[in-house]
């Protein structure tokens, strides 16, 4: 099967078309802007899979309709999914702009005095606004000399933020969300909304009953040699935690082995269903070998599967991690309980950062007073205003233990292409696998148990769908918190100590839903959330604007908010602008 090519970024150098000295004097400077932009993006950004981003530059500078059409023909043949137009001078606005309505686009107008790059930028953006095709504006804060080929820091920040978000949009388009099962325990996010995926993300939904997973396991529609490798890997690396089940529910060694085997098979088969596996074709299973072209998936599990078969905890945790028996690799995106909306938040985070994502219940708000009452100890430092307990039995990536280290030796979660095998092993060593609690999971299973290291910056997100409004995005930047061991043990024991825990302290800004930690919890729109490494809320905001998803809650500094220029015409309140613009333009792929 032919591999689907990755989207590219097209660079469009536009120029004043007047000959007899004007165009000729600008050719080199204009093309050099395009080359510098391409070099910056190629150096600084990778696709979520780890591949280097490829930029395609128009063959000539673009002065009018003919050269614009020639550029578009080239881009169409090379899978260009995002465009950046660059110029140091005046050009002919609507004659030179990118008119593809579904392709994210930005314009960098050079801030210089010799030629009016800012004037073209304003004219072109006016054309975009009038035609209903929003574009992002890039204009340096400080004037540069005409022969200055450097890219200022503020311009670089906008170029890279736009490129990251634009590539996420282009990478999701044409892919599918694999819904394995249906609605889990009445959770609204697992009522998978096909219109949302199609109209806002440009994706399809592939709905598959959980009996397909059962069929693949029972009929050995998997790589049997790989199963043996996975079992050997688990035997070497899994540490098993306390079995908290009553004696009548404890399994013997043979039963536990069967649960482990089926859990690993679930991981293999869900992966094969998502992306395909050519080994199956070698076994004569050509249809099954193709997969469903899924960039994200969800597994219902509870309760129609878990009342009889091992739960999805092990499979989900391993798939969402950056490593398994095959070594370090790109993490998958698999949502527990088929919560497709949390799965989309995971997908956004992975596409923007290349890292694994932590799926969690937004379980409990602990006030400083409640913590002191229960433990006799006071919260301090990052936790002084209270904490939120993020915990779930299922698909928290093992990277979430934060045993990887950044360039300063601090705990983090790295893009998979930066993770060493030693760091992967450290995450495994920090994880215990605890037998599932029988009352919840009658078919058994193993839940991963780890504790996220403290002081790590995270961004918590969630997508919700509001009837009459559509999808909205919530964002809360903050930090993981390390509690004294005795305090952690007491608080953890009050819920389920066999599950992975992250203690989270959102950054407070003294107003709205970020007045205090309680308000963050009270304003969260659903029972699940996602943690993405770093304070990357600004990237989420830019991505959401491209997709026309308004942001209903965030604590990102206003100076970092980057949306299309047309948003400014939708009122003076920056968040009201977002709602009005998203309503005005409608979903990116509306029909």
UniProtKB/Swiss-Prot annotation:
Its cofactor is Mn(2+). One of its GO terms (cellular component) is cytoplasm. GO terms for molecular function: arabinose isomerase activity; L-fucose isomerase activity; manganese ion binding. The keyword Hydrolase does not apply. Belongs to the L-fucose isomerase family. Homohexamer. This is L-fucose isomerase. The gene is fucI.
């Amino acid at each position: 099967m032919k591999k689907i090519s990755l989207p590219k970024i097209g660079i469009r150098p536009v120029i004043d078309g007047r000959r007899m000295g004007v165009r000729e004097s600008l050719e080199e400077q204009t093309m050099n802007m395009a080359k510098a932009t391409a070099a910056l993006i190629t150096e600084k950004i990778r696709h979520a899979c780890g591949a280097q981003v490829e930029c395609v530059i128009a063959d000539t500078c673009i002065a009018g309709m003919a050269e614009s059409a020639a550029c578009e023909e080239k881009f169409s043949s090379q899978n260009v999914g995002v465009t950046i137009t660059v110029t140091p001078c005046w050009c002919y606005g609507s004659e030179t702009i990118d008119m593809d309505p579904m392709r994210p686009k930005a314009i960098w107008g050079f801030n210089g005095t010799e030629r009016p790059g800012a004037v073209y930028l304003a004219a072109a953006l006016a054309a975009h606004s009038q035609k209903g095709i929003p574009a992002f504006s890039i204009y340096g804060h400080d004037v540069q000399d005409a022969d200055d080929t450097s890219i200022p820091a503020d311009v670089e920040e906008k170029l890279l933020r736009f490129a990251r978000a634009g590539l996420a949009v282009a990478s999701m388009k044409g892919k599918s969300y694999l819904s394995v099962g249906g609605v889990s325990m009445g959770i609204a996010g697992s009522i998978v909304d096909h219109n949302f995926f199609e109209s806002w993300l440009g994706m399809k939904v592939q709905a598959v009953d959980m009996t397909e997973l059962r069929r693949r396991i029972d009929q050995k529609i998997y790589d049997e040699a790989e199963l043996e490798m996975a079992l050997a890997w688990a035997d070497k690396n899994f540490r098993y935690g306390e079995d908290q089940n009553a004696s009548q529910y404890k399994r013997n060694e043979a039963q536990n082995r069967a649960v482990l085997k089926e859990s690993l098979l679930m991981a293999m088969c869900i992966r094969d269903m998502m992306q395909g596996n050519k080994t199956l074709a070698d076994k004569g299973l050509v249809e099954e070998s193709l997969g469903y072209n899924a960039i994200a998936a969800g597994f219902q599990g509870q309760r129609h599967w878990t009342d009889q078969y091992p739960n999805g905890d092990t499979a989900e945790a391993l798939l969402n991690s950056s490593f398994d028996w095959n070594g370090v690799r790109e993490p998958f995106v698999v949502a527990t309980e088929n919560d497709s909306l949390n799965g989309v938040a995971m997908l956004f985070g992975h596409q923007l950062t290349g890292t694994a994502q932590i799926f969690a219940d937004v379980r409990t708000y602990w006030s400083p007073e409640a913590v002191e009452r229960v433990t006799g100890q006071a919260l301090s430092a990052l936790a002084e205003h209270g904490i939120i307990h993020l915990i779930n039995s299922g698909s928290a990536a093992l990277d979430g233990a934060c045993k990887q280290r950044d360039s300063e030796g601090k705990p983090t979660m790295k893009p998979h292409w930066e993770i060493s095998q030693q760091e992967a092993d450290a995450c495994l060593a920090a994880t215990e696998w605890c037998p599932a609690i029988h009352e919840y999971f009658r078919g058994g299973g193993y839940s991963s148990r780890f504790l996220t290291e403290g002081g790590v910056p995270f961004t918590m997100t969630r997508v919700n769908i509001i009837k009459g409004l559509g999808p909205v995005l919530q964002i809360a930047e903050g930090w993981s918190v390390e509690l004294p061991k005795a305090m952690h043990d007491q608080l953890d024991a009050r819920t389920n100590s066999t599950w992975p825990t992250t203690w989270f302290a959102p950054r407070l800004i003294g107003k709205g839903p970020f007045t205090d930690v309680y308000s963050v919890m009270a304003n969260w729109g659903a029972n699940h959330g996602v943690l993405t490494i770093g304070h990357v809320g600004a990237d989420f905001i830019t991505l959401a604007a491209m997709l026309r998803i308004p942001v209903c809650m965030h604590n990102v500094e206003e100076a970092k908010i980057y949306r299309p220029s047309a948003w400014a015409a939708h009122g003076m309140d920056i968040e009201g602008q977002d709602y009005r613009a998203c309503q005005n333009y409608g979903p990116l792929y509306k029909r």
